[in-house]
Amino acid sequence: MSPQTETKASAGFKAGVKDYKLTYYTPEYETKDTDILAAFRVTPQPGVPPEEAGAAVAAESSTGTWTTVWTDGLTSLDRYKGRCYHIEPVAGEESQFIAYVAYPLDLFEEGSVTNMFTSIVGNVFGFKALXALRLEDLRIPVAYVKTFQGPPHGIQVERDKLNKYGRPLLGCTIKPKLGLSAKNYGRAVYECLRGGLDFTKDDENVNSQPFMRWRDRFLFCAEAIYKAQAETGEIKGHYLNATAGTCEDMMKRAVFARELGVPIVMHDYLTGGFTANTTLAHYCRDNGLLLHIHRAMHAVIDRQKNHGMHFRVLAKALRMSGGDHIHAGTVVGKLEGEREITLGFVDLLRDDFIEKDRSRGIYFTQDWVSLPGVLPVRSGGIHVWHMPALTEIFGDDSVLQFGGGTLGHPWGNAPGAVANRVALEACVQARNEGRDLAREGNEVIRXASKWSPELAAACEVWKEIKFEFEAMDTL
C-alpha cells in the first residue's frame, strides 16, 4: 500500500457505492427561509424504494454522484447538499410520490435562471433509477428573488405607458402566420389597430425569413402603428418579434425597434433561452420598451403529467428572468388549460404574495416582494362568445388575444377588431353594473350585437364553434 493510499484510509475515506438515502434523505430537516424548495413527482423504477428515489433526486441535482469520491472530504457536504425532507404518495396513482427537496441558496448563481435550472432540472431527469420525474413547483426564497430584475416594467407601469385602465387589453396575432410580404403584413396590422385593438402580434414563427425580412416588417408595422394612433387617438402597439439565431441579432432588432419609437417587442423565451431573455429584459427596462413573451415549446416540457416540468414553474422562471406579458392558457378555446390550475399560475404571475393551495396546484407559499407582475395572455381558439367568460374569469389584468377571432370576420380585419372591442366594452360595463357574466354573458353579447352590425356578424359566424376535449393538466 502506498503512503498516499494509507493517508486516505487513515482520514476515513471509504471508496465504493452507497445508498443515496444514507446521506440525502433527511426527514428530520427543518427548511430554512433561504432554501429553494422543490416538489418533484417521482415515479421510481420497480424495486426502488421512494425514499431512495427522492434522495437520488436530491443528490443528483446538487452535490452527489454515483459513487463516493475522496474530494467530498475537501468541502462541507452538510452545507451544500440538497436534502429530500418529505415524501408523500400521489392520490390515485399507485407508484408515484411527491418528493420535497431543499437546496441551500449557495448552490445557485445570483440572478441566473439558467444556472438554477441547470441544477434542478438537469441530468437528474435522465437518471436510470427513475421511470419518470416531473418538477411540479418551486419555492423561490426572498433572498434569491431580490437578485433578479424581473419584468422590465410590470402591470401598473404598462397601463400608465398605454393610458389604458379598467379593462383587459385586446390583441390579435396576424394570420396567415407565414407567407405575407412585409407591406401586406403592415396593412393587416393597421386595419386591426384602427378597428379598436390595443395590440397586434407577430406570430412566434415569424423571425426573418426570405418572404419577409425583419427590418422590412418592423418598418411597415411602425408605419401602421403611427397611422392607427393618429386616427383613433389611442396608444397602439405591435409585438415585434426580436427572437433571432444569435443574441447579437436579437439585440440588433430590439435596438431598431427602440429607434422606431414603438412601445413593445417580443421574445420566444424557451426557444431563445433564459440567458438571451434576461439580457433582452434588462435592455427593455433601460430603454422603455415593454416585453411580450411567447412560450413556444412549453408543451414539449409541461404537457405530460408524470415527466417534465409544470408550467407554473416555467411561469415563475419567466417572472424572474423578465417579461411584461406571457401566454398562459385560456380555460376556454383550443389550447390546454384546466380552470383552477390555470388560475393558480395566473396568480403566481400577477400577485405579490401567493399562499400555498394544493387545490390549485400551488405547493408552496411564494413571496415575490417587489418583483413586478406579469400580464397573462389568453389566446388560442377564442372568439366573441368567449368574451364574457374571459372577462369574468381573468379580470382586468390580462390580455385577450383573438387571432382567427379577429381576422376570420366575414367583413375583414377592421370589422373583426370592432366586434371584439364592442363585445369587451359591453362585458366590462355589464360587470361594473353588477351583472353576473357567468350566467348572463350570452345575453350581454346579444344585446350589444343589436347596435353593432360587426358584432352581430361575428356572433353568427362563431355561434357553433366549440373545442370540447378533456384537459390533460389535472391535479
Curated annotation (Swiss-Prot):
Organism encoding this protein: Viburnum acerifolium (Mapleleaf viburnum)
Cofactor, how bound (note): Binds 1 Mg(2+) ion per subunit.
Annotated propeptide span(s): 1-2
Subunit structure: Heterohexadecamer of 8 large chains and 8 small chains; disulfide-linked. The disulfide link is formed within the large subunit homodimers.
GO biological process, one term: photorespiration
Main location: plastid
Modification N6,N6,N6-trimethyllysine occurs at: K14
CDD domains, A to Z: RuBisCO_large_I (cd08212)
UniProt keywords, alphabetically: Acetylation, Calvin cycle, Carbon dioxide fixation, Chloroplast, Disulfide bond, Lyase, Magnesium, Metal-binding, Methylation, Monooxygenase, Oxidoreductase, Photorespiration, Photosynthesis, Plastid
SUPFAM superfamilies: RuBisCo, C-terminal domain, RuBisCO, large subunit, small (N-terminal) domain
Domain of life, source organism: Eukaryota
Active site: K175, H294
Protein's recorded name: Ribulose bisphosphate carboxylase large chain
Modified residues (N-acetylproline): P3
Positions that bind substrate: N123, T173, K177, R295, H327, S379
Sequence intervals crossing the membrane: none
Gene Ontology MF terms: magnesium ion binding; monooxygenase activity; ribulose-bisphosphate carboxylase activity
Requisite cofactors: Mg(2+)
EC number: 4.1.1.39
Family per similarity comment: Belongs to the RuBisCO large chain family. Type I subfamily.
Post-translational note: The disulfide bond which can form in the large chain dimeric partners within the hexadecamer appears to be associated with oxidative stress and protein turnover.
The reaction(s) this protein catalyses: 2 (2R)-3-phosphoglycerate + 2 H(+) = D-ribulose 1,5-bisphosphate + CO2 + H2O; D-ribulose 1,5-bisphosphate + O2 = 2-phosphoglycolate + (2R)-3-phosphoglycerate + 2 H(+)
Encoding gene, per UniProt annotation: rbcL
Note: The basic functional RuBisCO is composed of a large chain homodimer in a 'head-to-tail' conformation. In form I RuBisCO this homodimer is arranged in a barrel-like tetramer with the small subunits forming a tetrameric 'cap' on each end of the 'barrel'.
Site (Transition state stabilizer): K334
PROSITE patterns: RUBISCO_LARGE
Binding of Mg(2+), residues: K201, D203, E204
